[in-house]
Amino acid sequence: MSLEVFEKLEAKVQQAIDTITLLQMEIEELKEKNNSLAQEVQSAQHQREELERENNSLKEQQSGWQERLQALLGRMEEV
């Protein structure tokens, strides 16, 4: 009878070990996925910063062209 109890206990211990092993593998996969996503976020933030700089530059250029256009229109009205 104690052999049966020992075998049941051994089976439960083995099941626990298997579960722990699977969970450790899942943790490693999730860590890798997390690192990958963190890199994607960093890349997206960098791209956003570049686009914001480009947008500001284009706004400045547009403002400059509008000023030139207003100056030309002012000269045309004088003529």
Swiss-Prot record:
Pfam families listed in its UniProt record: ZapB (PF06005)
A GO cellular component annotation in the UniProt record: cytoplasm
GO biological processes: division septum assembly; FtsZ-dependent cytokinesis
Bias (Polar residues): 36-45
Keywords: Cell cycle, Cell division, Coiled coil, Cytoplasm, Septation
Record Gene3D superfamilies: 1.20.5.340
Tree of life domain: Bacteria
InterPro entries: Cell_div_ZapB
Residue stretches of biased makeup (Basic and acidic residues): 46-57
Cystine residue pairs: none
Region (Disordered): 36-64
Keyword Nucleotide-binding: no
Coiled coil stretches, renumbered: 3-79
Subcellular location: Cytoplasm
Entry-linked HAMAP family: ZapB
Subunit note: Homodimer. The ends of the coiled-coil dimer bind to each other, forming polymers. Interacts with FtsZ.
Function per UniProt: Non-essential, abundant cell division factor that is required for proper Z-ring formation. It is recruited early to the divisome by direct interaction with FtsZ, stimulating Z-ring assembly and thereby promoting cell division earlier in the cell cycle. Its recruitment to the Z-ring requires functional FtsA or ZipA.
Sequence similarity: Belongs to the ZapB family.
Name under which the protein is recorded: Cell division protein ZapB
